[in-house]
């Protein structure tokens, strides 16, 4: 496994692999990898000749109240995990090589103004910008994203379509702990009591899945989910919403494919979860 730290050396390696006719898969990450990331890398390994993992804490997706420096980092552990999973290359650039001020941004506004975009207004602009940069640097045949970040996945798909990237976007299932909590680096911030309280998210997902059906009013589903979360004293709802699976806009009734998503604070830690329903 190789590690590159500049755009130039990454492109040189990719160029050689392309000359050999190799297919390339990319798993974009911000590091501090867990089993959710591992599932993406495994899927990528199954479907491509070359597996590239980006390990880059992207500064442009952090808002003014979000602490970039506090984001957890452990590149040694990340690289060991990637090597065990059969990755061929880790792209680990310095921010100064990725961004030169002033720099351009990529933004998909129509899908970014609901759900997480309401309270994190610059987040998806930063995500789209760094992902488009990685796509241009790595030029992968396929790129892998987790469905836990469902709004992000929808935005990336839209960006690829609108900007004519010749890349297949592969969405991979949410990976959960044995008790149902969705895997996340943020879980490490939870105290023992908060960790137990956080299970209200997966219980709410289960209640929503048990309730939803074609034609039902969105509020009937969302009310049951909110009740479960509101019964937990340590939980504070950011949002619990049902949106169109394609344009991320709110729906009043289940008449097409939908995404049911939530963001909930457990203490000071913001967690997300979701499920999809196909009509």
Model-predicted segments: where are they?
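Phosphate/ribose-recognition catalytic cores of enzymes acting on nucleotide-derived substrates
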Residues: 224-279
